Amino acid sequence: VKAEALAAQLSDEYGVEARPASSARETVAQSDLVVTATTSREPVFRGEWLEEGTHVSGIGANAPAKQELDGETFRRSKIVVDFREQTLQEAGDLREAISAGVISADDVHAELGEIITGRKEGRANSREITLFKSVGIAVEDIATAAFVYEQAMAKGLGAQMALDGESLRNSAV
């Protein structure tokens, strides 16, 4: 009942069809896009559930002990990462797939920048399963924060805050 109410609310609010699924398997099998953003220590779905043509964005599991994607997901996918060296060191699920021998580091097809600049091919055909594995790049976060800050200042938005310990203690709810 809660899931149906939430689906109705989301449909109304965003003007898209939202409907509850009976299982993670059903959800994954019926999705063109699967996004995971978890701190899970074990896979949240099975790669065998993915249909041809699906895109997976795995943006969690950003530490060696975490694993939101299974080896089968990596094995079946064209793998793209944000920054190869960092992802190979930090993405627990990718590291697990490599250490289990399901894939090798050479199976990482490209960095996202290589696809954007045309140095590497993206999706080769409509049946290919693609996977973007991201652990985040701090310099991109800083650049984004600086851009947002500059835009807010230019538009007179936001509020000044002191960041000393006393101010922070007094502002706690």
Feature roles, as predicted:
Residues 1-14:
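NAD(P)-binding Rossmann-fold cofactor-contacting core
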Residues 10, 48, 152:
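Active-site catalytic pocket residues across diverse enzymes, especially alpha/beta-hydrolases
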Residues 14-18, 125-127:
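A short helix-to-beta-strand connector/capping loop
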Residues 16-102:
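Rossmann-like adenosine-cofactor binding region
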Residues 33, 171-172:
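Anionic, Ser/Thr-rich low-complexity intrinsically disordered regions
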Residues 66-171:
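Adenosine-phosphate binding glycine-rich loop
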